[in-house]
Amino acid sequence: MKEFPKNYNFTENEKKWQQIWQEKQIYAYNPNVAKEETYVIDTPPPTVSGQLHIGHVYSYTQTDFIVRFQRMMGKNIFYPMGFDDNGLPTERLVEKQKQIKAYNMDRSEFIKICEEVVESEEEKFRSLFNQIALSVDWSLEYQTISPLSRKISQMSFLDLVQKEEIYLTNQPILWDPVDGTALAQADIEDKEKTSFMNYITFKTEQGDPLTIATTRPELLPACVAVFYHPDDGRYKHLAGKSAITPLFNEQVPLLADPLVRQDKGTGLVMCCTFGDQTDITWWKTHNLPLKTIITKKGTIDFQHETSIDGLKIKEARTKIIDILKEQELLIKQEDITHTVKCAERSGAPLEILTVPQWFVKTISHKEELLKRANELNWHPKNMKIRLENWINAISWDWCISRQRYFGVPFPVWYSKRVGEEGKILYADVTQLPIDPLKDLPMGYSKEEVEPDYDVMDTWATSSVSPQLSTHGISDDFAVNKDRHDKLFPMDLRPQAHEIIRTWAFYTILKAHLHQNTLPWKNIMISGWCLAEDRSKMSKSKGNVLVPEKLLEQYGSDVIRYWSANSKLGADTAYSEDVMKNGKRLVNKLWNAAKFVFIHFDKLKGEDKKASLLDIKEKITNEFDKWMVNKLVELVKLATNELQNYEYAHAMHLTEKFFWVVFCDNYLEISKTRSYDEEHKNPQGQYSSILTLYHVMQTLLKLFAPFMPHITEELYQILYSKNSIHVKGSWVNYSDLNYEINAKGAEGLLEILDIVRKFKAEKNLSIKAPIKLLEVSGIVLSAELAEDLKNVTSAEEIQFEMKDDKIKVNIIL
């Protein structure tokens, strides 16, 4: 008989199994298996934008629980890993790391530095993802900046151009003056900021004073109208008249519009091009002129004696206020707190500029997208409302132009040929991927075209993350149409809740526009990982947890255990207590396996190879049969929970069964029969060892999606040299059931619980002998009574039926 190892070294074993799994290609996708038998995951490509943190471990392992389960259920798994390594987030990382600014250096040199940085950062991700045992097929890896990804992203653009779902227009857009780029509505966040409401004197053309209130007096040079509410009796007499702006003496119309709030300020509002979205609405509705005074760098460009030209926005605001005070045109100021739209990444307050940009039609599809949201299977269901709320709130088409460098270029040029100046020239699909700064459209020379210098929003590429893996966009645009048709739509999109409005929304939009379908059948939403005090982790607070230290301290299985204890979609605080519980569970699994291992040499070889269903008749003891029935019930419950993406429920059920039903009760109750050193009950002994053998094997399989290393190690020691994680290794006991009266076994457990409490109260050892157990309320079978005698160390047990309530009298 081989020896059971003395102890479990997680550091050595985890590295060992990670290497073996890779070498044996345990997680390899088989492209020859039918679509119906394949389970396809749209893995979140992590943004290459900074330090790895415990949140990466938290969310990615939760996906892996489901993937491992589906593989064990017999599915051919397509589980890729990508890296979202283009766009503004990566540029900001590079600028910070290298202490450089993209705009201060050659474009090609900056791109080269970006490529070097992302290669280094991605290797860190690969290392971490292997350490936490993500069962991805690394041969399916992609980068959003790779030539193939650029080709597919540009295919997406051309397909939407062909479908007339993309357009180029010169219209107001949200502009980040810090990062120097246009942004989409989803790239902004509302921030509460303190400011002043400034009450300023205008005049009518007749010289009558008018008071308007504004938070942005620096936009006075861009004022094109003054508005009042049509029902506001204070100002109805102004209809058809004009106002004169202070300092700049520009004549602007006085107009009525229902968007004016009568209760805000004075009820008179100046319309500037542009201070906010209402200004845009008024500008369009009333056909007002355009006055642009803000540059792309966030400075004022307006030649005037007020000397605000060249000043930054805040500086210009202060300067204008000072001048208004000097000329007694500022009546008063009120301290206010108001909501300001800011760039999500730079944090800068946004401006609205008029710049030619590419847009994807979005507003016209809102109703269709709401229907798509309802067609999708949401896990958990309550997350659907977040997407619905976002769709309902959309007020802009999706601006996909970015004035940056490290991104996917638009496959576009503009003609300079005589007679067709400005004509948009699109690349032919056979040319993709192209860089219009280096390549040329078919039939044109360099002198005849102007390239589009912008790059696409990074979401424009990551929104086709499924297609980056399937290698196709639509029937007309595909690198490998057979592969695309086999993998798309996918089965699962796992992601965090804060990017529902971006990644989920944009991917649904693209799939809808490209192929009139959903991109996946299911979406699984994870929450945030919080600090132990339930605050959000941040570098400024110093509470960011680094995965490497935790892996060194606890190992991957314990960290995965912590992640599995978090309910799907819920924000969860890091917990040392949960980590310690996970470590305790690993140790208990090891010790329980060590106990059952010593009995396995007593089993016949054919019974070890047979399934539990095949050797059903050899399990003869009543308590063993009850144990198997409880195991079958557990398998059904855990399987159902995992099929519904409720990994935490499955983990909880399995762990509770292991600790309470198996370790605390079954191992103790069957121990005497399992040893049976005097050979008093060979049939009962064989029954118990068979039960131990199959229950332990099943429990290892139920724990395997969550704790892959310890379960693999024990499975190899106890059962097989084949991996526990291979396709089709899950258990199915749907046809297994013993026809027994469960009340007997449950009565035994109730009596045992009473005896244990009695001995604990008396400070007696659990093995302390008992002369007599007097039990009323139940009569156990001879087999169960014998097990009860053994586990309680009772010399004699007497039963009588007085009533249905179990009572126990203990005589020492």
From Swiss-Prot:
Q: Per its record, what are the GO molecular function terms?
A: aminoacyl-tRNA deacylase activity; ATP binding; valine-tRNA ligase activity
InterPro entries, alphabetically?
aa-tRNA-synth_I_CS (IPR001412), aa-tRNA-synth_Ia (IPR002300), Anticodon_Ia_Val (IPR033705), M/V/L/I-tRNA-synth_anticd-bd (IPR013155), Rossmann-like_a/b/a_fold (IPR014729), tRNAsynth_Ia_anticodon-bd (IPR009080), Val/Leu/Ile-tRNA-synth_edit (IPR009008), Valine-tRNA_ligase_type_2 (IPR022874)
Presence of the UniProt keyword ATP-binding in the record: yes
Instruction: Please give the SUPFAM superfamilies that the UniProt record associates with this protein.
Output: Anticodon-binding domain of a subclass of class I aminoacyl-tRNA synthetases (SSF47323), Nucleotidylyl transferase (SSF52374), ValRS/IleRS/LeuRS editing domain (SSF50677)
- Catalyses which reaction(s): tRNA(Val) + L-valine + ATP = L-valyl-tRNA(Val) + AMP + diphosphate
GO terms, biological process: valyl-tRNA aminoacylation
Mind telling me which PROSITE patterns this protein's record contains? AA_TRNA_LIGASE_I
Keyword Aminoacyl-tRNA synthetase appears in the UniProt entry = yes
Give the motif span ('HIGH' region).
46-56
- Keyword annotations from UniProtKB, A to Z: Aminoacyl-tRNA synthetase, ATP-binding, Cytoplasm, Ligase, Nucleotide-binding, Protein biosynthesis
Q: Name one GO cellular component term.
A: cytosol
The positions annotated for binding ATP are: K539
The UniProt record lists the EC number as: 6.1.1.9
- According to its UniProt record, this protein's enzyme class is ligase
Where it sits in the cell: the answer is: Cytoplasm
Domain of life of the organism encoding this protein: Bacteria
Motif span ('KMSKS' region)? 536-540
Subunit structure as annotated in this protein's UniProt entry: Monomer.
Family, as annotated = Belongs to the class-I aminoacyl-tRNA synthetase family. ValS type 2 subfamily.
Purpose? Catalyzes the attachment of valine to tRNA(Val). As ValRS can inadvertently accommodate and process structurally similar amino acids such as threonine, to avoid such errors, it has a 'posttransfer' editing activity that hydrolyzes mischarged Thr-tRNA(Val) in a tRNA-dependent manner.
Q: What is known of its domains?
A: ValRS has two distinct active sites: one for aminoacylation and one for editing. The misactivated threonine is translocated from the active site to the editing site.
The name this protein carries in UniProt is Valine--tRNA ligase
Q: State the gene name recorded for this protein.
A: valS
